[in-house]
């Protein structure tokens, strides 16, 4: 199942200068509860905005052609270096001994790279990422705007936090969704000592 999760203002604003506009503790708590143990897919800017990098206890997928090409280039260099070392060693090996060829090659038909240092999988596109997910995998699309736009036609469900406010400044917006989705459940929350605006947890399914 593909689920889009986001916090949106009345005008569908979601961010400003690559940062969230609203800081809602209950929204963050809900986000953690829904996504923990599952796969999250995000764009490069969303990944870079995470204070501590990859989110724990989740499979983190980052969509980025530049990161993918960079990782591809680094791995090719490592492969070529390993091959060169093997070729050089061949001149000094006694006859009859076999030298194992480098086993670290980039799969020609696989476009994914796992970066263990960052605990992320990198794909050049959403299509490629979804192709490398299991059919029964619970997938959460967490942003940003361009990834939301790409994922919206493919999504099965929307889990939105709708905030009863229109921010003064915003440069990133969630795509229009009202015409194709119907409300499945709603949980309204008033202003309190930790939340400056009324908000609602709203789940949508396709009409």
Where are these regions (language model features)?
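Intrinsic disorder/low-complexity segments
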Residues: 65-120, 131
